[in-house]
């Protein structure tokens, strides 16, 4: 049995397995398969997909909508631990802003511009990326900023009422599994192959997310969308609760067992 997540090193392995009639499962996280997976699909037994649109574009006997497994430790966060870690109170909702590992300059800049207005309604956790801290905001009440968080991330998610994030496949699947109402700001097509835009629009169509493209960001637009997201948060939680992305691990392991048993 071969299981592949893509990448150029997997291509000869999957092709060789196909020639030897060894069951092979590919997992594609993004809406449009990357080059390695495109090459491997003819040799694969099944293709696990993250989006309904991807399933429709692939051979019907191969494509399966499974979603993407997430880190299980993210499901076990503690609100109380996060509140103590951040020094927050329990009298305002919490907005978490995730700028990505390198930080999203336009997101960081505009969040900080509207921070005085945001702090009237929210407490804000800002994961701003390496080298993107603003020391002038260090002691601002109700606002904490970190370059990067690992150990406490599950706790911060548990405390957060709504989240702003990029639209990488793994990130949005984590938000979906955690049922966190979210605003996605995908990487622009100028800075990527456009997969984040496609990912975000699919989640928007399914009722999981709001989307604001980077070119559309202004102070007033960002503030209004955040308020709208919070006001309608329950509808997003409901949609995510009904999502086919739930139980991804069970779906994929079941598929592996089926393929092995049919040898």
Predicted ranges, named:
Residues 1, 146, 158-173, 180-181:
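Acidic donor-binding loop of glycosyltransferase active sites
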Residues 1-20:
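An aromatic- and histidine-rich active-site surface loop
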Residues 18-80, 88:
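Active-site-proximal region of nucleotide-activated glycan assembly enzymes
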Residues 22-23, 161-162, 179-187, 208:
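Structural loop-to-beta junction motif characteristic of Rossmann-like glycosyltransferase folds
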Residues 42-43, 155-159, 177:
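Alpha-helix C-terminal capping/helix-to-coil transition sites in glycosyltransferase folds
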Residues 79-81, 88-165, 197-199, 205, ...:
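Donor-nucleotide binding loops and adjacent catalytic segments primarily
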Residues 234-246:
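A short, well-ordered alpha-helix in the C-terminal region of glycosyltransferases
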Residues 245-263:
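C-terminal alpha-helical cap of glycosyltransferases
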């Amino acid at each position: 049995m071969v299981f592949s997540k893509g990448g150029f090193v997997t291509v000869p392995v999957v092709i060789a397995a196909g020639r030897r009639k060894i069951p092979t499962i590919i997992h594609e996280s993004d809406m449009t398969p990357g080059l390695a997976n495109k090459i491997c699909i003819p040799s694969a037994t099944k293709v696990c997909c993250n989006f309904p649109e991807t399933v429709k574009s692939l051979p019907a006997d191969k494509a399966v909508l499974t979603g993407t497994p997430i880190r299980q430790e993210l499901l076990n966060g503690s609100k109380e631990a996060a509140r103590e870690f951040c020094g927050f109170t329990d009298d305002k909702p919490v907005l978490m802003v995730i700028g990505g590992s390198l930080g999203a300059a336009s997101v960081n800049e505009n969040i900080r511009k509207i921070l005085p207005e945001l702090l009237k309604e929210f407490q804000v956790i800002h994961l701003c990326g390496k080298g993107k801290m603003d020391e002038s905001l260090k002691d601002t009440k109700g606002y904490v900023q970190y370059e990067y968080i690992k150990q406490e991330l599950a706790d911060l998610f548990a405390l957060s009422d709504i989240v702003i994030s990029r639209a990488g496949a793994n990130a949005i699947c984590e938000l979906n599994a955690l049922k966190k109402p979210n605003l996605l700001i995908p990487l622009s097509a100028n800075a990527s192959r456009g997969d984040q835009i496609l990912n975000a629009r699919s989640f928007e169509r399914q009722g999981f997310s709001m989307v604001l493209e980077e070119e559309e960001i202004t102070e007033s637009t960002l503030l209004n969308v955040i308020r709208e997201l919070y006001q309608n948060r329950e509808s997003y939680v409901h949609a995510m609760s009904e999502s086919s992305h739930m139980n991804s691990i069970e779906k994929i392991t079941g598929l592996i067992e089926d393929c092995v048993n049919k040898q």
